[in-house]
UniProtKB/Swiss-Prot annotation:
The lineage of its organism: Bacteria, Bacillati, Actinomycetota, Actinomycetes, Mycobacteriales. It is an enzyme of class 5 (isomerase). It is found in: Cytoplasm. The gene is groEL. Together with its co-chaperonin GroES, plays an essential role in assisting protein folding. The GroEL-GroES system forms a nano-cage that allows encapsulation of the non-native substrate proteins and provides a physical environment optimized to promote and accelerate protein folding. GO terms for molecular function: ATP binding; ATP-dependent protein folding chaperone; isomerase activity. The keyword Cytoplasm applies. Its EC number is 5.6.1.7. Keywords: ATP-binding, Chaperone, Cytoplasm, Isomerase, Nucleotide-binding, Stress response. This is Chaperonin GroEL.
Length: 151
């Protein structure tokens, strides 16, 4: 069995019989996938926010709210929240900041430290590949130039 707290991994596993529930589940899967594609993290938060928007949206429509007006209101709120987040965002620049951020995202500070070290070695334009291994532990391997695994 796989143990995960990653929203996109969990969302992919949801299969429902009821056609209306299935539409909702597909919507949440799409939210999680798009979030993962764009940000690489935050899928659980995006999934919870999507569920809250759907729940409250349906409640408001059932109470007589205009669905198009509700949609416009949500879009305005999204613009305002995005603007506020961008204003309060801070660039992650130092190796220590990268290690702290990556450690929180990975849920393991030793992984965060290794990611910061890898980023320090390859720079902002470099490529970092994470692979599973049959051995225990973490290791960093630097390949300069290009590498072709097959072919």
């Amino acid at each position: 069995p796989t143990i995960t707290n990653d929203g996109v991994s969990i969302a992919k596993e949801i299969e429902l019989e009821d056609p209306y529930e299935k539409i909702g589940a597909e919507l949440v899967k799409e939210v999680a996938k798009k979030t993962d594609d764009v940000a690489g993290d935050g899928t659980t938060t995006a999934t919870v926010l999507a569920q809250a928007l759907v729940k409250e949206g349906l409640r408001n429509v059932a109470a007589g709210a205009n669905p198009l007006g509700l949609k416009r209101g949500i879009e305005k709120a999204v613009e305002k929240v995005t603007e506020t987040l961008l204003k309060s965002a801070k660039e992650v620049e130092t190796k220590e900041q990268i290690a702290a951020t990556a450690g929180i995202s990975a849920g393991d500070q030793s992984i965060g430290d290794l990611i910061a070290e890898a980023m320090d070695k390859v720079g902002n334009e470099g490529v970092i590949t994470v692979e599973e291994s049959n051995t225990f532990g973490l290791q960093l391997e630097l390949t300069e130039g290009m590498r072709f695994d097959k072919g």
